From Swiss-Prot:
Part of the ABC transporter FtsEX involved in cellular division. Keywords: Cell cycle, Cell division, Cell inner membrane, Cell membrane, Membrane, Transmembrane, Transmembrane helix. The gene is ftsX. Forms a membrane-associated complex with FtsE. This is Cell division protein FtsX. It comes from Haemophilus influenzae (strain ATCC 51907 / DSM 11121 / KW20 / Rd). The chain crosses the membrane at residues 32-52, 177-197, 235-255, 280-300. It comes from the Bacteria.
Length: 310
């Protein structure tokens, strides 16, 4: 009994899908316009999400973590400087550090600055010893980093502590802004998709009014009557999602050359990322849900309105 019921449901579903597809193909121009409107509506939040995704990837790739640069007093002897370094190492929130002595700082400066001969004229080394500190993950948030910076400044022998996170904070703020823009676009375009599907289903319901009346006279259930409209809404949304993914891919490809030009200037390696497989599947699932819900709301409402008028 169960197998025959399953087969009956499968046959009914296949028959309804064929009928819906034949109807959509018969009025293919209107179907194409509806799908394109849905696709454009979905492309906007998809591209906004991809902008946020790529900026977030760039932020984590080029600025994976912030560092604190500590400048020691120049009048410290090498022995006292080592004692200060040990105090810094024992400070809570310090994961690792790299100590560069005054002599090493001068040697590095000579090697890349090209002022080696000029620096030989000076009687005293003008560069301080430097300690580069990597904070622990707990202290890698803004408030904790500031707290660590304050504590390091209190250590005797420390002249200045600089927090190298200006670009990180700017990129994080920009990423936050784009994320909110993406959310706003998603909400607006989701409403637009519901309206487009609802309007299309409304037209289908009123054009099939006589068929609906006949089915009701024959004792058809509401679910049976609604099924073609639900499938129509899901097909609209699914095809719109597929076209939106294609549009998004074209847009990412278009901007890839521009991004490569910029990254070549800055001598870094970065390429734009499109939708992953999981993200693509998630987009299609969301489209199916939107199509189903939008079609159900529109069809139920307008069929009920027709019944009240009768």
């Amino acid at each position: 009994m169960s197998r025959s019921t399953d087969a009956s449901v499968f046959v009914q579903t296949a028959y309804t899908l064929r009928a819906v597809w034949a109807d959509l193909w018969q009025r293919k121009f209107g179907t194409l316009l509806t799908i394109l409107v849905i696709a454009v509506s979905l492309t906007i939040p998809t591209v906004s999400y991809l902008m946020w995704k790529n900026l977030h990837l760039a932020t984590t790739q080029f600025y994976p973590e912030s560092e604190l640069t500590i400048y020691l007093h120049k009048n410290l002897s090498e022995e006292n400087a080592n004692l200060v370094v040990e105090k810094i190492r024992q400070q809570k929130g310090v994961e690792s550090l790299n100590y560069v002595s005054r002599q090493e700082s001068l040697k590095e400066f000579k090697s890349w600055s090209g002022f080696g001969e000029e620096l030989e004229i000076l009687d005293d080394n003008p560069l301080p010893a430097v300690v580069i500190v990597k904070p622990t993950s707990e202290f890698n948030v803004s408030e904790k980093r500031d707290e660590l910076r304050t504590n390091l400044n209190k250590i005797k022998g420390v002249q200045e502590v600089r927090l190298d996170n200006d670009w990180m904070e700017k990129l994080t703020a920009l990423s936050w802004l784009i994320a909110h823009v993406a959310i706003f676009c998603t909400v607006l375009m989701t409403i637009a998709v519901f309206l487009v599907i609802g309007n299309s289903i409304r037209s289908d319901v009123y054009s099939s009014r006589s068929s609906i009346d006949v089915m009701k006279l024959l004792g058809a259930t509401d679910q049976f009557i609604l099924r073609p409209y639900l499938y129509t809404g899901m097909i609209y949304a699914l095809l719109g999602g597929l076209v939106a993914a294609i549009f998004s891919s074209f847009i990412i490809s278009y901007f890839t050359s521009a991004v490569k030009y910029v990254t070549d200037i800055f001598a870094v390696q970065f390429s734009l990322n499109g939708l992953g497989v999981g993200e693509f599947v998630f987009l299609l699932v969301c489209c199916l849900i939107m199509g189903y819900v939008g079609a159900w709301i529109a069809a139920t409402r307008h069929i009920a309105m027709m019944e009240r008028k009768e």
